[in-house]
Each structure stands twice: as structure tokens, then as C-alpha cells.
Amino acid sequence: MGPITTTNLLFYTFSDGEKLIYTDSDGIAQYGTTHILPPDEVSYINLFINGILQPQPLYQVSNGQLILLDNQPPTQGSSIILQFIIIN
């Protein structure tokens, strides 16, 4: 059995200090993909806010949308990175 091929895609954006819902249009193309992939097309999804891995119960991902399930948005300027890992 040879090496397992994987793909690692990253969706980057920054918090405006107000929103809890982010869409494809919030993605910053210079840093990564601008498309939020649907969970059924990837093997794993990880969310990092300011570099800290977030527990899965704190967010929902669907095709084109990230919803933060918190009553407070991240501080303005906080980095939001959604990592998609695809194991082929």
C-alpha cells in the first residue's frame, strides 16, 4: 500500500466584530479558497479562530456557509480559518 493522498484547502476571513454567519463572499482569495465546501465532500473540517482550534459543537458548516453557534462574535480583526481535509 502506497502513500495516501490528501488535499488541504483553507478558507480565510477576518471577523468584523458583528457577524456570526460567514459566506463564500467573505473569503479572502489571496490567502486560500473562497468557497466553503459542503461537509459531505470532505473528510474533515477544522475551524480556527485566532489560531485556536474550535470544538465542533460551536459551529456549523454547509455549502457556502459557516455559522458560529455562539452568542458573541469573535473580536473585530480576529482571523477565521476553516480547514478542509480531503483524503483520497
Ranges and model annotations:
Residues 1-46, 53, 82, 88:
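Extended beta-strand solenoid/passenger and fiber regions
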Residues 46-49, 71-73:
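Glycine-rich loops and low-complexity Gly/Arg-rich segments
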Residues 55, 59-88:
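Surface-exposed interaction regions enriched in Ser/Thr/Asp/Glu
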